[in-house]
Amino acid sequence: MLQQFCLWKWLAVGIAVATILASSLAQNDEDCKLARTGPPATIVPIDEESRNGTILVDNMLIKGTAAGPDPTIELSLKDNVDYWVILDPISQRLYLNSTGRVLDRDPPMSIQSIVVQVQCVNKKVGTIINHEVRIVVRDRNDNSPQFQQQRYYVAVNELTPVGTTIFTGFSGNNGATDIDDGPNGQIEYVIQYNPNDKTSNRTFDIPLTLSGAVVLRERLNYEEKTRYFVIVQANDRAQNLHERRTSTTTLTVDVLDGDDLGPMFLPCVLVNNTRDCRPLTYQASLPELTDPVHVNPISVTPPIQAIDQDRNIQPPSDRPGILYSILVGTPEDYPQYFHMNLTTAELTLLKPINRDLHQKFDLVIKAEQDNGHPLPAFANLHIEVLDENNQKPYFTKSTYEGFILESSPVGTTISDSRNLTSPLQITVLDNDVEETKDPQLHLFLNDYNTFFTVTQSGITRYLTLLQPVDREAQQLYTFSMIASDGVQESTPVTVNIVVIDANDNSPTFSNISYNVKIYTDMGPGEGVIKLTAVDADEGPNGQIVYEILAGDQGDFIINDRTGLIAIAPGVVLSVGRSYALTVKASDSAPPAQRRSSITTVYIEVLPPNNQSPPRFPQLMYSLEVSEAMRTGAILLNLQAFDREGDPIRYLIENGDPQQVFNLSQSSGLLALGKPLDRESTDRYILIVTASDGRPDGTSTATVNIVVTDVNDNGPVFDMFLPKNLSVQEEEANAFVGQVRATDPDAGVNGQVHYSLANFKNLFRITSNGSIYTAVKLNREVRDYYELIVEATDGAVDPRRSTLTLAIKVLDIDDNSPVFTNASYSVLVPENLPPGTVFLQIEAKDVDLGSNVTYRIRTQEALEYFALNKYTGELSLLKSLDYESFSDTDATFTFLVEAFDSKGTMPPGLATVTVRVKDMNDYSPVFSKTLYRGMVAPDAVKGTVITTVSAEDQDPPGTPASRVRYKVDVVQFPYSASIFDVEENSGRVVTRVNLNEEPSTVFKLVVIAYDDGDPVKFNTTTVEIAVLQPSVIPRFTQDEYRPPPVSESAPKGTVVTVVMAAALNQTIVYSIVSGNEEDVFAINNRTGVISVKKPLDYERVTSYELRVQADSLQVVRSNLRVPSKSNTAKVFIEVKDENDHAPVFTKKMYIGGVSEDAKMFSSVLKVKADDKDTGNYSAMQYRLIIPPIKDGKEGFVIEAYTGLIKTAMLFKNMRRSYFKFQVIATDDYGKGLSSKADVLVSVVNQLDMQVIVSNVPPTLVEQNKDQLIGILERYVQDQIPGATVVVESIGARRFGDGYSEEDYTKSDLMVYAIDPQTNRAIMRNELFKFLDGKLLDINKEFQPYLGQGGRILEIRTPDVVANVKKQAQAVGYTEGALLALAVIIILCCMPAILIVMVSYRQRQAECAKTARIQMALPAGKPASTAANNLYEELGDSTILFLLYHFQQSRGKKSVLEEGDRQRVISSFASRAIEAHKQSNINGSLNNNLPKSSSNITFLSDENPLTTQNPLYVEGVTQSPAAAGLLRKRSDALDTLSPMQLVLRDASLGGSHRAWTVPAHVTKRHAPGSLSRPVIMDPVQWQQERLKAENEGTENQHSRVDISSPLFQKISGPTLTVKEKARQFEQQALQEMKQVKSPDVKSTRSPTHSICLQERDNTLEQSPKSVFASPCLRSSPLSSPTPCEVVEPEPSAVPSVIITHHDYPEELSPPPTRKPTPPSFRIKKPVCQSFLAPQTKGEVTENIPDPPKTPPPPPPLLPPPPPSPPLLPPHPPTLPLASVPSSSSLPSTQHLSPAKHSKSPAKQPAVPPPAAVPEPPPRRELKGILKNIQNLAAIEKSVANMYSQIDKNHVLPKHISKLKPVATPELPTPEAAAEHNQQNGNLSCVVEELEKRFPSQSTAL
């Protein structure tokens, strides 16, 4: 046993080991394999230029472990070229190895992929597996495009058409290249804006951006611009626009001059701002009867010359010559007298002209080009024929006297009077010339010709001033004047010119100042000194007036005429006083021209005897002397005064070492002795002495003389600066050199300014003398400049000096070689041997040191031609054969280019056209060697006799193959004189009218020749026989005019019959002309002409046939004999038939009509054309249109004009459209018809745009169709087939509200209609279509709007703009309303404050009234007590109820009071019973669930129970929210599902029972309010009948319907107190409405808190069921039944109010059974409303109550007293007793389905808790002592008040409603119980009356 156990144990161990080994071996086999699926190779992408260490493969996913103590695999890299990859074997990760290098996919590295092998060695098994890793290098856009050349060049002729490709140099490898790959390497070319050449980007374009072909976009004009610099940008096509790289180059486009302008006559005076010349008239004059030899060529002024405006056509040999001619002239026989040389324009006289016949010639001369493209120019030539010069010129006067003001400027005309108002007219005539014409005389002055000159043209001449005159120098100029006509001279006349004085001289004193000594013994009036001033003028200008200006101090006076200064009267002189009088001398000229000067008189008062030394008037004298002062000029009077009068001697003691000044020793006058030079000495200080010869008789004075500067020195250039300068061409603002100049003068006279005297447009100089180039210089235009620099100082009359600089322009390689001809054309004869040189081309490079080489650029031409690269000789490589080419292509055209071997500029290009000349190989060959013909002896000129024909075997279309004919005049000259052959057709005709003898035979030799080179020819002979007249038939009529033939005439219809007669001859008829289309046929024997082919009047209206009659003998010989008699004309008229239907000009007419269009407004005009004529083309139009509105057609059409008009109004029909058909019938509606479609779309100004142009509306109206066509084309570019319609054309409207009009501009209002949508295109879209193309539209509008006419803007119509403006602005009415609202709010603020204060007062009264104590008998217990009623209602509610109760008691009738007492008693009993259930041990149990009891106002029909939303938890319908619904809904007439019958219509309402539930438990809400129930009226009645049959057994299972009256409304939910306060507010509002005298009918119950206006009794019921349908707030919806929830059996008993005390006569029997509810919409009166709804699902969710309290309710004043509505003592109705809860009969309820959910069970009542001792309170008296928990009773009473009819106003007429099912009568026990409760209620009321009398709480 043990052995077996060991055996089995070892066997198990072996099996385990084997299993482990097997699994290990299997695992080893999987190592080195990939752990992933998919392809074996690993492919990863990587961007080029990735950084070193970038992870290539995160994990190779190779099975096995390469790390650890026992690795299973070993990894390594193989084929790792350049070691780009690094392997981490542990993590199986691959890295990029780019250390010290960059992974670049682009050349030169060009690494596009890297392939390595990851080798895996299985260390367990030993197998090796290689895993391929392929790394794809992705391209990055890291290279910019690179152009192969820095610049590109192309030359374009200005006549190149727009759209021509002018440059393809960017194609291939010549453009830009990008070494990137894919889109990064693809190149696009675009033209960029060049700020230095602003028109280049719009002149050229690259439409195909990938090809780079430059296309001409705008027309070139060599005269405006000769070169363009086009910036071409090359960019790659990277996907990300921001990553695209670009580079630019410049394409230089030279515009070549083309022959687009004609000649122009010189001289050309341009019209302002144009290139047009003003009309030019050449003048010439010829003496009469002059021999042409003496005057030829005629002298013309100016010489006639015209030049071609295209002055630079290359090569010069292509420039056209100019041909001159006289186009037209008057008189018409001018060609007899004049001839103009065709090339030189020399005018020659052909014969003498008699002036009696012709006095003048007015000719129009023409100059045109000689190249077949004339482009003529015109000028006028006026030639005067002069009378024979045998009369002397003569003046009309013998003496002329003129006047001129001496101050007149040069050029003034001499006047004929002293007032200088009119010029002096010198009239000179010559009797050889008409008096009205200029005699063209020359006038000469024999003297004073440097002062005066005379005009040299016209009959009247004028003398003008050449230089100023001075009257003071010479007052009268007298000279003689002679007139000469070149042959004879006139008699001299005398001319006296009087110079009128001008006030040009000022009065001058002899001295600058005067010194006078006077003595104290001199008396008043005694003279002191007499001053004299001199004025050279005459008259008032020379009369001098003196006056003392200052310094006299009132002691001296002066005579204004004599200048005598005397002592003033009454003056006593004092010794030692001195005076300095300033005296002015003025002339008597007018004040504006008056001149004056002043002097100073120094007066010193001395005693009668004086022994003192001489004294100078001043110790210091200061004066300024100009350095230009003349020598000898008196500078200063230094006269001293000596009292004794001793002689004084004056000397200069110091300060004048060079003796520049002279001082008179005796007079003291200081004069200038030598010239002054400020630049050497600018100041002198002289010490002057005066001595009388006595000791101490010397005094001194100092004279300070400042030498002022004059501009006597010019600027001097620095000659050490270089004057030979150089500058490189093609550089703007390049520095050229520097100059410097100095001026020794002072101030502005020494300030130096530089300027250039020449080449100012090429160079500029700065203020410091630096010279720069102003523009780029072109050495090829000019390589050397002598620039003159001028330096000026700053003086008024500046001095100048100049310096000449030599500037050499240095060359750069900036020009390509230019061929002497832009194109070469050569004619090469065929069959020339190879090597023949047939053309030499030449190109020149204006750059220095250039060597030009040539080559053929077109590869195809290299097969035939060779070009010597140095000489430019073109030669043949092989012989050319003309016949080897096609008929039209025997021409080679290829490009040759010239290179500058050392330069970098693009090559010059030229076009060579080689035309192979066909050599004439064959001669023409006639078809016959002999031709015969016959002719009548009287044949007229041009009669065709026969036709010769020859052919040439040369290639067709070549000149060598063209055959022409002529007559050999050498052989048979007479025959050649009467017969001829037509050159091209070969027809032999008579040259003259024949008159030959019959039977004569003539021979004529005809030559056929070609136009080949050389010309080859051949001859043939023609024999012409003249027939006898008798054998020639003669027609009976020369013309036949048959009746018109209908165009529908069938074939064979006879047209007419022609007849001819001949002697013994059989006549054969034929049609010889006019029947080219073979329309008619003639019977050759009978002469009957018939129709052969159908006629078409629309194509040919008439035929003119020429028929010929010949004898049968002649016909048989295949000849014809035309003569005068054997031919006749047949005129056949074709009669039109109505064989063409009308054709409309369009298949569909599209138009529009405005919404505000009036009746019969024009919409559009249709037109149909008919090829027929007459009435057959007269149209009648009609419409096929279905009725549009009220059975009327919307449009009508004028029957004969096609004008469609409106027949209805289209108001508010925008975006509508109408489609109909128009039918056109010709022959005024009796003929053929055709139809077209018409589309009319209704638009308004919202669809329109206004096109404002600067031309008048009339011009727009005239060109409306053309302008609309242009607009339509641009709109159709966006929307094919669109039509543009004109709405109106008027004056431009502008200003505020577009109320102003400008008739110089126009508004064109248009809109466009889309044929796809049949509606107007949106206004914004139309604006985009037109505004984006405004420039192009203006270009096309230009021919129609005139010069300068254009579109100014495109805007929206003024109506749309005004609507927008009005929508943005608040009107005055709105503003006034807003202001009124603000005022009302401000006025309401005091009222709000009063309400708040009153509310506080009411709260205080509420607290007092709440302490009312009342004792009531015990009621019957109920199943569930009401809980927390006091807290739920709040003190405000109690206050309101008491207030309302007291007001009602005091103002209502006895009947109303009794009803109210019964209600209160019954309600109070129920409240106490409910209170006892919630009272445990005298305390209020707050943990019990809230009551679900109901208070129901019951009508005499089935009670309908509803919940009171005031106490329902979670209901969001607050009075505020209900107010929202009231705004959105209408009140319903009834909510009951029964139709009631009322006796009086004034009684409103449905008399339904409405139950106000106290509260619904939270857990009841989901089941009662969220479950939808759908019930229609039929289902409702069935359910109702079913509920009636259930009886009392189902009483406990009936459901209590939760009120679904309110839908879920977003907003805050309210607490119970807040709801109570809002309920109070609502009750006050309803009371006010009910008591208002306006209310005519009772309100229907539309809200759970709305009270029925009827009298009710209280009845206790265990439960009541709500059976009213739930309605939504929509006023248009129907009632929808809601789900009914069955309450628990222990539901709170309800207090039921039933009718009582109503007379039976007021309750009529029912007239019909109740029906489902009908609704009547009326004004809402309740807080919330229910709206009808057809059928729907109602789901309500009651949210949680809000946390924010509502605002306090407004306080209302007490309602006014209402009169009683019933008699004071009405009979009472029998009262039903209230049964007990166990025996209460079933009332009429509507109980829906039994599946309604039941509420959850109520929680258990907790055990009583210890109640703390209440605070002390006032001792109660009487019955109130026995009432426990008085507070709870007070709350019950308050609840009672809230449910009483607050608006207890009985209606005037009450109709008692009959219930559907009579309710069971109450039992006697129930009645007794009810009576007992009524009695108790009376006691309660009496006790309340005693304890709390009624009080008013008026606000």
UniProtKB/Swiss-Prot annotation:
Cadherin domain location: 38-147, 148-265, 278-395, 396-509, 510-616, 617-717, 719-819, 820-926, 927-1035, 1037-1144, 1145-1259
Protein name, as recorded: Protocadherin-15
Composition skew (Low complexity), residue ranges: 1774-1791
GO biological-process terms attached to the record: cell adhesion; homophilic cell adhesion via plasma membrane adhesion molecules; inner ear development; sensory perception of sound
Membrane topology: Single-pass type I membrane protein
Disulfide bonds: C32-C120
UniProt superkingdom: Eukaryota
Main location: membrane
Assigned keywords, A-Z: Calcium, Cell adhesion, Cell membrane, Disulfide bond, Membrane, Repeat, Signal, Transmembrane, Transmembrane helix
Tissue expression pattern: In the utricle, localizes to the distal region of the kinocilium and near the tips of the stereocilia.
One Pfam family it belongs to: Cadherin
Residue intervals annotated with topology Extracellular: 27-1376
Cell wall biogenesis/degradation found in the keyword field: no
Alphabetical list of SUPFAM superfamilies matching this protein: Cadherin-like
Organism listed in the record: Gallus gallus
PANTHER family associated with the record: DESMOGLEIN FAMILY MEMBER, NEURAL-CADHERIN
GO molecular function: calcium ion binding
Signal peptide: 1-26
Disordered: annotated span: 1668-1687, 1700-1721, 1734-1820
